[in-house]
Curated annotation (Swiss-Prot):
It comes from the Bacteria. Coiled coil: none annotated. CDD domains: YihA_EngB. Belongs to the TRAFAC class TrmE-Era-EngA-EngB-Septin-like GTPase superfamily. EngB GTPase family. Its cofactor is Mg(2+). The keyword Glycoprotein does not apply. Residues 29-213 form the EngB-type G domain. This is Probable GTP-binding protein EngB. GO terms for molecular function: GTP binding; metal ion binding.
Length: 217
């Protein structure tokens, strides 16, 4: 793997744009990893913990707050040819919010599917699953969509500090078995706690390996 001048997660990240429709997508440049999950799965909190910046991705107690594809990149790059950031993180709209109007849900669904299907620089989607609830029907629907689009994805359990520690290995094994036959699923399942910091280095390393950057911290 090539070395990069700066570690992926050892310096500040910045928000570059929100994408309400494909017309607003940035030009394809650095490799991208995306984060998907049900509303209030802790997606924004995990991104903030991952980069060590509390206010980067906006968190909210209101489900369905993220309605766009939100792009984040490491700071310190001009974005011009020869000075591109090594990667981008894409925070995807949360799904499964029962109170969202159907028109809004349809809009999110189209945006997400079009992005997944047509983004050549997208290397992997990290699908976040609340460790207290496991894989639910809406999650299965998203995994079906990713399998259909042939987009590589990896399951990341969140909020493991909310369950008893001895339950985590069992949950990891059960989750791995549930996705074993899915064609686009990466076999390793990760567990994380944004609150305690557990598993964050494992996720950072996984992302570094995915985008081909050896120096991730």
């Amino acid at each position: 793997m090539p070395e990069t001048e700066k570690p992926l997660f050892g310096h500040p990240w910045i928000f570059i744009r929100g994408v309400p429709s494909l017309n607003f997508l940035p030009p394809e440049g650095p490799l991208e990893v995306a984060f998907a999950g049900r509303s209030n799965v802790g997606k924004s909190s995990l991104i903030n913990a991952l980069v060590g910046q509390k206010g980067l991705a906006r968190t909210s107690n209101t489900p369905g707050r993220t309605q766009e594809l939100n792009y984040f990149v490491p700071d310190g790059y001009s974005g011009e040819s020869g000075d591109m950031p090594p990667m981008a993180i894409v925070d995807m709209p949360g799904y499964g919010y029962a109170q969202a109007p159907k028109e809004q849900v349809d809009k999110w669904t189209k945006l997400v599917f079009d992005y997944l299907r047509g983004r050549a620089t997208l290397k992997r989607v990290y699908v976040l699953i609340d460790s207290r609830h496991g894989i639910k029907k809406n999650d299965d629907d998203v995994l079906d969509l990713l399998d259909k689009a042939a987009v590589s994805y990896q399951i990341v359990l969140t909020k493991t500090d909310k369950i008893k520690a001895p339950a985590v290995p069992k949950l990891l094994a059960e989750t791995a078995e549930k996705i074993r036959k899915r064609p686009a699923a990466y076999p390793g399942v990760l567990s994380t706690s944004s609150e305690k910091g557990d598993g964050l280095d494992d996720l950072r390393q996984a992302i570094g390996e995915t985008v081909g950057v050896a120096r991730w911290k």
